Amino acid sequence: MTILVLGGRGKTASRLAALLDAAKTPFLVGSSSTSQESPYNSSHFNWYEKTTWDNPFAEIGKHGLQPISAVYLVGPPTMDMVPPMIQFVDLACSKGVQRFVLVSASNIEKGDHSMGQVHAYLDSLPGVEYVALRPTWFMENLLEDPQRTWIKNESQVVSATGEGKIPFISADDIASVAFHCLTEWGSHKTEYIIQGPELLSYGQVAEILTSILGKKITHRSLSEAEYTNILVDEIGMPADFAAMSAAMEVDVKNSPQETLNGSVEEVTGNPPRFFRTFAEHEKQKWV
């Protein structure tokens, strides 16, 4: 069994690759930014270049790997993700892939827009196993710009969530769940909403950062339109995807999550990481 890991340098895919490597599980990384310096077997894969989709299946022989039987499915950051992802799923199935682990989002139900439609398509395929991972907000988003720069230089976190609370999750915990879903075979057509162990507003996140960094961090609350513009102007996110991301933030404000589940511990045997633990470990990146 060889596992294809798409989104090779992404937050969860890079961590999943490290777990698979440590476990000596055969895998191949598919990424648009492959490098000869990569420590892992890799193949050029670009969602926007259909001619690259066959590369991982054609190149496994040169890496001394068995045929690909499972795929970690991370889509492109665009609202037009559904047609290419479904086409790739069909290609992968024709090559003998038996299982997919799809990365979706906690507030995108099966059959909804974007990843929700891919989720529904996987569910409709006979003889195909899948697990849809639906994580909440990543703690690691605070380590990336513009949030990292805002924390470091402007002493603030920025969101459109108001005082809505989020069960922030670490990418390490998501990768651990994905690892178990990919390597522990069984009859699966299921989903996991992946949450952290506590509900926090961005205001509470700011308070935790204040206590760790030794300087006052505040929460700047934006409107949906203001946050959309920031995602486009400061991150370079496509406008339609930025609008979807901002709308998801506003959903937190209007319909806050008030319950927690134990999915991480259920799947991995270990509880998820608390935000304070994460922030203490990463604090030098905000100094």
UniProtKB/Swiss-Prot annotation:
Keyword Oxidoreductase: yes
Gene Ontology biological process: indole alkaloid biosynthetic process
GO MF entry, a single one: oxidoreductase activity
InterPro entries documented for this protein: Ergot_Alk_Oxidoreductase (IPR051604), Ergot_alkaloid_biosynthesis (IPR019901), NAD(P)-bd_dom_sf (IPR036291)
Pathway the protein takes part in: Alkaloid biosynthesis; ergot alkaloid biosynthesis
The protein's Enzyme Commission number: 1.5.1.44
Disulfide bonds: none
Superkingdom as given in the UniProt entry: Eukaryota
Keywords annotated in UniProt: Alkaloid metabolism, NAD, Oxidoreductase
Catalytic reactions of this protein: festuclavine + NAD(+) = 6,8-dimethyl-6,7-didehydroergoline + NADH + H(+)
SUPFAM superfamilies: NAD(P)-binding Rossmann-fold domains
Protein role: Festuclavine synthase; part of the gene cluster that mediates the biosynthesis of isofumigaclavines, fungal ergot alkaloids. The tryptophan dimethylallyltransferase ifgA catalyzes the first step of ergot alkaloid biosynthesis by condensing dimethylallyl diphosphate (DMAP) and tryptophan to form 4-dimethylallyl-L-tryptophan. The second step is catalyzed by the methyltransferase ifgB that methylates 4-dimethylallyl-L-tryptophan in the presence of S-adenosyl-L-methionine, resulting in the formation of N-methyl-dimethylallyl-L-tryptophan.
Family classification: Belongs to the fgaFS/easG family.
The protein's name: Festuclavine synthase I
Species the sequence originates in: Penicillium roqueforti (strain FM164)
Gene that encodes the chain: ifgF1
